[in-house]
């Protein structure tokens, strides 16, 4: 029989992309007494999509742009396939997120001569909406998020691939996740 190592945590986050790292930061800030674990199939911030972002982060900051226009560009660009409630939430919270990325996480984005954030339009956008750091926006965001997470008491499981969800007794929710440690082959 294969021996399985057991670890307990209060909050388990799978993935160390932008969403995973933001989740870890928000969980730790909201409930610092809880044990938070970040599990990633590779190395923290060396895998995932966020680090590959070249374009930037879309946010309606005025100058003729609105959250409504951002939302419609998102829906039309997605050929009406996006979940509209989620798309609205994404567009509506974008100003809050860009402020958080700059003021709390420490990201630096390109600026106009007057000091305002530089924005440019990408395919399908009806306004200059994309905040960026040259063409390395993803690396800027993921690097600053990683710095913040590494400063906090968040357990990190690197090179651990989730291979099965373990349902809770009664079928309501999950009681665990089965991982394989990619370095050792152990569960």
Where are these regions (language model features)?
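N-terminal Rossmann-like FAD-binding beta1-loop-alpha1 element of flavoenzymes
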Residues: 11-38
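Core beta-strand elements of the Rossmann-like FAD/NAD(P) dinucleotide-binding domain
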Residues: 6-9, 183-187
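Conserved N-terminal/central alpha/beta ligand/cofactor-binding core
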Residues: 3, 34-35, 40-184
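Glycine/serine-rich loop-strand microenvironments at binding/catalytic pocket rims
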Residues: 1-13, 100
């Amino acid at each position: 029989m294969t021996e399985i190592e057991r670890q307990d945590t209060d909050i388990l986050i799978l993935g160390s992309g932008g969403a995973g790292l933001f989740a870890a930061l928000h969980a730790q800030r909201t409930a610092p007494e809880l044990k938070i674990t970040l599990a990633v199939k590779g190395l923290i911030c060396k895998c995932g999509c966020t680090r590959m972002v070249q374009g930037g982060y879309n946010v309606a900051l005025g100058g003729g742009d609105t959250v409504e226009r951002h939302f419609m560009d998102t829906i039309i660009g997605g050929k009406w396939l996006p979940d509209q409630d989620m798309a609205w939430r994404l567009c509506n919270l974008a100003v809050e997120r860009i402020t958080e990325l700059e003021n709390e996480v420490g990201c630096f984005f390109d600026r106009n001569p007057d000091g305002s954030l530089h924005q440019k339009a990408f395919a399908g956008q009806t306004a200059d909406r994309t905040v960026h750091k040259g063409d390395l926006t993803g690396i800027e965001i993921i690097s600053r998020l990683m710095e913040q997470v590494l400063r906090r008491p968040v357990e990190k499981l690197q090179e651990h691939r989730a291979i099965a969800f373990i349902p809770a007794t009664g079928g309501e929710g999950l009681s665990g996740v089965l991982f394989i440690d990619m370095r050792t082959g152990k569960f």
